[in-house]
Amino acid sequence: MSVLPTPLANQLLIALPALSDPTFSRSVALICQHDENGAMGVLVNRPSEYTLGEVLSQMGIDTDDEPLREQIVLSGGPVHPERGFVIHDDAREWDSSLEVGQGVFLTTSRDILEAMAAGNGPRNVLVALGCAGWGAGQLEFELGENSWLTAPSDANVLFATALEDRWQTAAGRIGVDLFRLTDYSGHA
């Protein structure tokens, strides 16, 4: 029987420079669930081609809040790209919500979007279409292959850092400069 390392929920998964898969290259994912069956996360630094206004309109939700309508929706990953995932810091009871950890929540129900459209939503929020998933042992294998770094989740990285800066900023929080890393080793 293998022992699962410390679960990675509420950790940021930071792609190392050698990770060349275009979906995950230079990505940062918030790990939302992690257990012996696998892991689920949402990429938090990949813009999609959609604005929140377009998504709300497709769902029949109206809002006059122009900054909300212009908010970029993230591409959260290749799994369930038709589903919405809302990462936020609002502990209210939503229809389908999970506490990722330390005041960070993942909600997948329509009620949070309706509250946002009405001006009653979370103060800090990321909306994504799709998520990332890893089968049993897959993420642990990828970590062992040096594809990823992990760092504690950080509200500043999630909600206050520009999308294009999240990759380097997340790594910098643990003292790593990703531009100084190489993907090969030398021998003496």
UniProtKB/Swiss-Prot annotation:
Which family is this protein grouped under? Belongs to the UPF0301 (AlgH) family.
Q: Whose protein is this, by species?
A: Xanthomonas oryzae pv. oryzae (strain KACC10331 / KXO85)
A Pfam match is: DUF179
Cellular component (GO) terms are: cytosol
Stored InterPro entries: AlgH-like
**Which protein, by its recorded name, is this?**
UPF0301 protein XOO1425
Cystine pairs annotated here are: none
